[in-house]
Amino acid sequence: MRKKKTEVYALRRHISLSADKARRVIDQIRGRSYEETLMILELMPYRACSPISKLVYSAAANANSNMGSNKANLVISNAEVNEGTTRKKFKPRARGHCYPIKRRTCHITIGVKDISLDDEYEQIYSLKKPRWKNKYTTMIYHDIDSIGRVWDKK
């Protein structure tokens, strides 16, 4: 008996972006849930976030249409960045010289897994520690006059 397919991929090739810059963003979203991934990509200030978020949307749409899975059950299981082709141009310089310009491209693959269909992944996901710290700080009121005039000193 064949296993039911629980993972769906989305692939985008020849993105005009360096592979190292894309890996910086991909490493942050690997292993996270679909909603958490979209929030992270929305708030990160990098240029690589836009094509990666489009790929995450596409992978979720593929999972919805191919397997009929709910987007709340999706987890980014596989995310990889490979180097693509490098376009070479030449910039004309003084006295007949030219400097080479390399336009690097990359290929990004994102795999999305439905955790409701996979029993083994549910057990691992329940044991996983959260990545944020559960530290709560309390606000303490300080009386400024009792401390002294700190701002008057030069």
From Swiss-Prot:
Any one GO molecular function term: structural constituent of ribosome
Keyword Magnesium: no
Compartments where located: Plastid, Chloroplast
Principal cellular location given in the protein's record: plastid
Keyword rRNA-binding: yes
Keyword list, A-Z: Chloroplast, Plastid, Ribonucleoprotein, Ribosomal protein, RNA-binding, rRNA-binding
Domain of life: Eukaryota
Cellular component GO terms held in the UniProt record: chloroplast; large ribosomal subunit
Any Pfam family: Ribosomal_L22
InterPro entries: Ribosomal_uL22, Ribosomal_uL22_bac/chlpt-type, Ribosomal_uL22_bac/org-type, Ribosomal_uL22_sf
GO biological processes: translation
NCBIfam families xrefs: rplV_bact
Record family assignment: Belongs to the universal ribosomal protein uL22 family.
PANTHER family: CHLOROPLAST 50S RIBOSOMAL PROTEIN L22-RELATED (PTHR13501), LARGE RIBOSOMAL SUBUNIT PROTEIN UL22M (PTHR13501:SF10)
SUBUNIT field: Part of the 50S ribosomal subunit.
Function per UniProt: This protein binds specifically to 23S rRNA.
Name under which the protein is recorded: Large ribosomal subunit protein uL22c
Protein species of origin: Jasminum nudiflorum
Protein's gene: rpl22
